[in-house]
């Protein structure tokens, strides 16, 4: 079996790599995993990958197997995705291509649109055009929010909807654009494809090993990080007002669950689109209360935001002008849930309750919200 993976140094991609290698080992598969990665400064792509495979958060089964033997499964293609070429076409013939690289950026700023579109859509198109003549199947890792603002029950098919989509930001738009491109081109080429869509990724929850670990803190973690450091810096906590739909929730799914679903699904021809999501979104008001309690910021309130809303203090201004304006479209969105019947039949969705959400935030706080950059 041959698999090509992009994004192996990322928060999700690294776990996909872990799971593929574990499958190779435990099932005695004669496999080759091609990793498209690039150097970072003076650190080569090989050194970056080796660092991930010999770290404190590497699964024990891989550490026990040993780095030297693990690298026997790997071939690292040291290049930037924007500069990829087909010079190694014979090696990768009939491989599964899992495109997990991308820029997660929920910015609503106009000056970020082109960058977000390039990193997610243009590079996806370039990669697809380069590799599609040689591969067996193209698996695109998108986002469960790529169909924009939704209400009610959300099914797995995002490409036969009878209404116009309303995207909250350039990221959602770029991801949906990429999905449409992949589906259209694969149909033309008669190339099998799969669109897999995680929701908001949280820390590990399968098993006890490195529980709640995640290498990059995004989305709800960023709110927790902001108020954690604000609480440490300020003796007097200024009141911050939040506009939240109290009926709505944030769909959070553990990173290791997402990776396992991808690795257990990419060979299935009966699945074209799949949302990798929780069966129950975590209530936004309860989530905010847990975050603020855990990071020690007590002075906040929930309001109905009006058109003449103006900042009442410095902290409120800093919050809204940094991450708040990007998170608000999710905090005020209509209530919805996802149909997880098919997903749960592949692997049972781990329960996310108040205790486990608290532990996610606590893990991040104890580790000072420090991302792991390799």
Which residues fall in each region the model found?
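Glycine-rich phosphate-binding loop and adjoining beta1-alpha1-beta2 segment
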Residues: 32-71
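A hydrophobic C-terminal alpha-helical subdomain
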Residues: 229-242, 307-349
């Amino acid at each position: 079996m041959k698999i090509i993976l992009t994004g192996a140094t990322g928060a999700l991609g690294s776990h996909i790599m872990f799971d593929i290698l574990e499958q190779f080992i435990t099932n005695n598969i004669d496999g080759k995993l091609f990793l498209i990665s690039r150097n970072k400064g003076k650190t080569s792509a090989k050194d970056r990958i080796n660092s991930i495979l010999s770290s404190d958060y590497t699964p024990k089964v891989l550490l026990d197997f040993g780095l030297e033997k693990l690298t026997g499964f790997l071939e690292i293609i040291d290049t930037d995705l924007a500069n990829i070429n087909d010079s190694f076409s014979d090696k990768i013939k009939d491989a599964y291509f899992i495109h997990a690289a991308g820029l997660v950026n929920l910015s609503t700023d106009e000056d970020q649109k082109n960058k977000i579109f390039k990193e997610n859509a243009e590079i996806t198109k370039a990669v697809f055009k380069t590799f599609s003549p040689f591969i067996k199947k193209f698996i695109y890792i998108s986002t469960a929010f790529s169909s924009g603002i939704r209400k009610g029950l959300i099914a797995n098919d995002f490409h036969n909807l009878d209404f116009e989509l309303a995207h909250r930001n350039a990221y959602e738009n770029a991801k949906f654009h990429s999905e449409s491109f992949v589906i259209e081109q694969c149909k033309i080429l008669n190339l099998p494809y799969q669109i897999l869509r995680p929701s908001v990724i949280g820390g590990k929850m399968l098993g006890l090993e490195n529980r709640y670990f995640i290498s990059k803190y995004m989305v709800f973690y960023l709110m927790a990080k902001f108020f954690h450091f604000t609480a440490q810096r300020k003796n007097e906590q200024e009141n911050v007002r939040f506009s939240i739909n109290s009926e709505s929730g944030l769909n959070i799914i553990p990173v290791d669950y997402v990776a396992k679903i991808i690795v257990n699904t990419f060979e299935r021809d009966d699945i074209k689109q799949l949302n990798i999501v929780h069966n129950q979104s975590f209530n936004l008001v309860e989530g905010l209360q847990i975050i603020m309690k855990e990071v020690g910021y007590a002075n906040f309130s929930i309001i109905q935001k009006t058109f003449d809303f103006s900042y009442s203090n410095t902290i409120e201004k800093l919050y809204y002008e940094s991450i708040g304006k990007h998170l608000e479209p999710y905090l005020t969105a209509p209530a919805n849930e996802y149909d997880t019947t098919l997903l749960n039949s592949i692997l049972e969705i781990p329960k996310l309750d108040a205790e486990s959400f608290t532990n996610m935030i606590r893990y991040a706080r104890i580790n000072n919200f420090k991302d792991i950059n390799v």
